[in-house]
Regions:
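Hydrophobic transmembrane alpha-helices and their helix-loop junctions in integral membrane proteins
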Residues: 1-220, 224-257
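Soluble catalytic regions of membrane-associated enzymes that act on cell-envelope
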Residues: 357
Length: 381
């Protein structure tokens, strides 16, 4: 709230399009330090909501105590959307300045959340730290400031919203039958609940990033964007985050083994219940179909993200006036198309003709055209 009032004092308006236009034209009446502090205030507020490591202290108890329906909303991605909508939209340059810190926190959050989930015996607390790990993946992707990383981050927001909803529905169904979230009270349920274990396995494999399912596409794009990002400085955080994929698969598969396989739990007299009902099948199978469709038909979904998602993420235009490697009369659209072509098709000389490629880029991608030694041909322009 303090940051919002401060921003109003600087701009004299709460209108988001006006604020964005003032930010992009550098007409906000404030020093760079003041704008940076204001952007950090917004980021901290949204980071608590996501949550971003180490601001996650509230998440475990909130998820463990809240009803399933509330948790499905609580574990949503409003914090991540807010970062894309407000921080990137109003403070694009300032967000890029703090990006290395957020990349590091994202990578640490992936590994930390996965390792803590490995030692949890409460299913809801395990799900809480799984939420932390997967939200950290999105943070890593969007703060790479590359097209592929940003697209992967937006795709992963959609993925985790669906996977999280399916997972918490399944936990609620399990609790409805047995009255506990403690994994030590379960075991050997696969023979009693074959359809339930099938849905659990599909959801877990999607969350773990199995190829041909939706989780793989998002994580692959994020790690690829992180690897190619100049903002990340080097590949250390990418490699570090990639280990979290292994730990993530470990705690998810370990949960399946403890709940549905092996011997009965500590209270075998309470092992009773029924498999999925017709209504529950209708609730869960659309999720499974979406996991597969988004994994196999990912180009279709990525085209939708390219068209609408990046606009929602407030991709800012770039001032290329200082770029002396291109002709002075090169238009911004031609520059963006040339940059996109060269990052998408390295080694090729694209024939754009003004229409064949999206005319968009991000501040972090400016690095890719600054080192060019020769002027582009007229055909390339």
């Amino acid at each position: 709230l303090v940051a919002i009032l401060w921003l109003y004092n600087l701009a004299g308006t709460f209108d988001l399009p006006t604020l964005r236009a003032l930010a992009l034209s550098h007409h906000l009446a404030a020093t760079p330090t003041a704008l940076l502090l204001c952007s950090i205030a917004f980021l901290v507020a949204f980071a608590v909501k996501v949550p971003v490591f180490p601001l996650h202290g509230w998440l475990q108890d909130a998820v463990a105590e809240a009803p399933t329906a509330v948790v499905m909303v609580l574990a949503g991605k409003l914090g991540l959307y807010s970062i894309l909508r407000f921080s990137f939209g109003i403070f694009p340059e300032q967000s890029r300045h703090v990006a290395p810190v957020l990349i590091a926190l994202g990578a640490i959050g992936i590994v930390y959340g996965s390792l803590i989930a490995l030692i949890k015996t409460d299913l809801k607390k395990l799900a809480a730290f799984s939420t932390l790990a997967h939200a950290s993946f999105v943070i890593l992707g969007i703060f790479t400031f590359t097209i592929i990383g940003l697209d992967g981050g937006i795709f992963q927001i959609l993925n985790e919203s669906l996977i999280g909803a399916a997972f918490f529905i399944l936990l609620g169904l399990l609790y409805e039958r047995y009255g506990t979230y403690d994994m030590r009270d379960y075991g050997g349920l696969a023979t009693r609940h074959p359809w339930m274990v099938t849905m659990f396995v599909i959801t877990v494999l999607a969350a773990a990033g199995l190829p041909m399912l939706n989780g793989f596409v998002g994580e692959f794009l994020i790690l690829s964007g992180s690897m190619s990002s100049i903002v990340a400085h080097h590949i250390f955080w990418t490699v570090f985050a990639a280990t979290g994929v292994i730990f993530g698969a470990s705690y998810l598969l370990w949960m399946i083994q403890r709940v549905f396989y092996g011997s009965l739990g500590h209270r075998p007299e309470e092992v009773r219940g029924w498999d999925l009902t017709a209504r529950e099948h209708l609730e869960l199978w659309p999720f499974a179909a979406l996991f597969l469709a988004m994994g196999i038909c990912s180009p279709f979904w990525m085209r939708a993200i390219d068209t609408y998602g990046t606009a929602a993420a407030s991709l800012q235009e770039i001032d290329y006036a200082a770029d002396a490697t291109l002709p002075a009369d090169t238009t911004t659209q031609d520059r963006l198309a040339l940059e996109h072509a060269r990052t998408t098709y390295p080694g090729l000389d694209p024939e754009l003709n003004g229409h064949s490629l999206p005319h968009r880029a991000h501040t972090g991608d400016l690095i890719t055209i600054l080192p060019l030694d020769s002027k582009p041909t007229q055909e390339a322009r």
